[in-house]
Amino acid sequence: MLLPQPKSTAKKPKGEAKSLVARERKSQPQDSALMEVPAKREMPKKEVKKIRSVHKVESVTKTKSAKLRRKKSYSLSSDNESKYKKSISPAASEEASIEKKKEEMTSKLPEKSVAMKTANSPKTFNMELAKKFFEMRMKESQRTSRMATKSDSSLETMPESSHNSGQSSKSRKSQRTRGKSTPLDRNIFKENGEPVWVVPDRKPGELVMNEHGEMVKYPELMAALEEDGLEMEDGKGWFQKMSSYLMGELDQGRIDNKAASKDINPFASMETLEERTDLYFSRETVIYNTTDSIFNLCHNAIERFSQQNNEDTIRKSVPPSREPGSKMMTVSKDEEEKTAIVTSIRFDARAYRISYDRRRPVHSIQKFRKKYQKQLKKSQEEKKDDTKTAKNEGD
């Protein structure tokens, strides 16, 4: 900002002030702008006369107040003009000093600076400072991006398919570590060839010494039965029990199932329930129930076995098998006279095909009906022709 020297009090014509403003606007360089503040004009002083009358004093006070108002309004208008408009240029004698100062200011400005002018406030833009600022911002952004990549690399992510496809077959085979698999023969079967679940290591049917000194085939089963208070008997002894069952000697262990099912009460006392279990699982009841089940299931087999042993019973003779063609048809004489000798036989071997379209079911059914009606007409006409020919031949 440059402030010009105060003007002289002498008045100058208006035309000269306008011409000076136009010259200064042309002479100002484009690279810089100057703000000029106008100097206050001093009006010539007037002689004040002393007024003695009252009426004249009032008129003087009114004129003074009016002058003060004018001065205030003028000062406000001058301030507004200095803010928003260019002021009037100084006198012509001071133009040389102002131009020198302008040249000095332009020489001090850097070469790369550019003047950015606006209507209200002119400013200069420094390119070097701007470059430095943007370089610093770029470096900071690069640092932040690197830090973000480092933090992301620590995360566990699934590899893409392209990375896996690049591996060689040898590296894949080396990564696969399989344990040694034992053969099935060792896992499932023993050395003697028997499966693992066969616990006793002995031949089937071989006798083994029991704890009581008895030779038994199944010692494990005997031990399990002894725990439950049961005995294992030989199967051949059941033949005698079957005969005693038929004679009615085992009726002591018989229980009426209908009466027992009516009296069952699951919420009864423990004493009654224990009595019921003793009754059902006693030795006599178990023998009776087993013989009863054997008799009912094997009744037909027992009858066949008894028939084989008895020599008196003769087996029913089964008639020999005959061929179906060997049977002779007995035909009466009347039927032979009525029936004519068959000379020709006709076989109808026409194939009848039906096509059905699921997309158009109604259309396919209509086609089928048309075909069926046509074939019926043909068959009826053929039958009529056959009957006519048969009548002609008979005549």
Curated annotation (Swiss-Prot):
Residues 144-164 have a biased composition (Polar residues). Residues 64-73, 170-179, 365-377 have a biased composition (Basic residues). Residues 1-121, 136-187, 308-335, 365-395 are annotated as: Disordered. This is Uncharacterized protein C09F5.7. Disulfide bonds: none annotated. Residues 13-28, 97-111, 378-395 have a biased composition (Basic and acidic residues).
